[in-house]
Amino acid sequence: MVDYYEVLGVQRHASPEDIKKAYRKLALKWHPDKNPENKEEAERKFKQVAEAYEVLSDAKKRDIYDKYGKEGLNGGGGGGSHFDSPFEFGFTFRNPDDVFREFFGGRDPFSFDFFEDPFEDFFGNRRGPRGSRSRGTGSFFSAFSGFPSFGSGFSSFDTGFTSFGSLGHGGLTSFSSTSFGGSGMGNFKSISTSTKMVNGRKITTKRIVENGQERVEVEEDGQLKSLTINGVADDDALAEERMRRGQNALPAQPAGLRPPKPPRPASLLRHAPHCLSEEEGEQDRPRAPGPWDPLASAAGLKEGGKRKKQKQREESKKKKSTKGNH
């Protein structure tokens, strides 16, 4: 007999949040539209996962299941007369697709995360704490007929929207999105870009989601201002992306933190040794005097001679005065 706890891969004391996380993961993994090469097994697994979630996510159904197993939900329970079951005539499981749609709020789980932010204000929705989302009135896809339905496979689509100001949302000037991927979730990728004018500045937000990792880049008038990965700012990735784009206008760094100048390439040392030796030689040896000027030399010698004669006269006077005293 199928054990619903084993189907979802959770412990018997799992919390409601654990059960939701398990269903989300397995429903996305086994959705028939994502497993066209193994559709029969995927449909079976998808149905089991939906049944397990439908029972374990409801406190009353879970309590009966824990006590009497699946038979208790069917109105049996090993004789059925020794307990009162609220499902006396048997519990009917819903269509797994209905469970799936209800869980994801009627929107395509393979793409709604990627469109959510640009359209939230437009539809009047507000995003709560990270990981929780307020559900809007109706399906996201019902607003625009160009989106694929749940049965279309979500394997590839490319769509764009412009001039949302005409729809009553003056701040959002443009939005475009591209999503693609094949069978399975391993190679699914989505890129969405939205542009807003805020106080005369063009703010562009680019979101890239690939293999479960979300990367968000925010530009202001063409200059990259912030970069987050899975909601966390990454300064190293920001610096690397700025470098790649040639946007090196980073904040001034203290002198001690500036990178040292790179050494001269070895190729230059090999190909121009005479140039380097001449430069280094000029730095090491003393500077030679300028051209010889005969007039300046004569003036110097004459001045030196006068000083020497004056010194001799002073010494002679001192000697005479010394003899007179004796």
Swiss-Prot record:
GO MF entries: ATPase activator activity; DNA binding; heat shock protein binding; Hsp70 protein binding; identical protein binding; protein folding chaperone; protein-folding chaperone binding; unfolded protein binding
Record region (Disordered): 249-326
GO biological process terms held by the UniProt record: actin cytoskeleton organization; chaperone-mediated protein folding; chorio-allantoic fusion; chorion development; extracellular matrix organization; intermediate filament organization; negative regulation of DNA-templated transcription; negative regulation of inclusion body assembly
Region feature Interaction with KRT18, mapped onto this chain: 119-242
Keyword field contains Cytoplasm: yes
InterPro entries: DnaJ_domain, DnaJ_domain_CS, DNJB2/6-like, J_dom_sf
Tissue occurrence: Widely expressed. Highest levels in testis and brain, and lower levels in heart, spleen, intestine, ovary, placenta, lung, kidney, pancreas, thymus, prostate, skeletal muscle, liver and leukocytes. In testis, expressed in germ cells in the earlier stages of differentiation pathway as well as in spermatids. In brain, expressed at a higher level in hippocampus and thalamus and a lower level in amygdala, substantia nigra, corpus callosum and caudate nucleus.
Annotated positions of the Phosphoserine modification: S277
Omega-N-methylarginine, modified sites: R135
All copies of domain J, residue ranges: 2-69
Classification via Gene3D superfamilies: DnaJ domain
Pfam families in the cross-refs: DnaJ (PF00226)
UniProt-listed SUPFAM superfamilies: Chaperone J-domain
Keyword Secreted: no
Sorted UniProt keywords: Chaperone, Cytoplasm, Disease variant, Limb-girdle muscular dystrophy, Methylation, Nucleus, Phosphoprotein
The protein's role, per its UniProt record: Has a stimulatory effect on the ATPase activity of HSP70 in a dose-dependent and time-dependent manner and hence acts as a co-chaperone of HSP70. Plays an indispensable role in the organization of KRT8/KRT18 filaments. Acts as an endogenous molecular chaperone for neuronal proteins including huntingtin. Suppresses aggregation and toxicity of polyglutamine-containing, aggregation-prone proteins. Also reduces cellular toxicity and caspase-3 activity.
Protein name in the entry: DnaJ homolog subfamily B member 6
The organism of origin for this protein: Homo sapiens (Human)
Organismal lineage: Eukaryota, Metazoa, Chordata, Craniata, Vertebrata
Gene name as annotated: DNAJB6
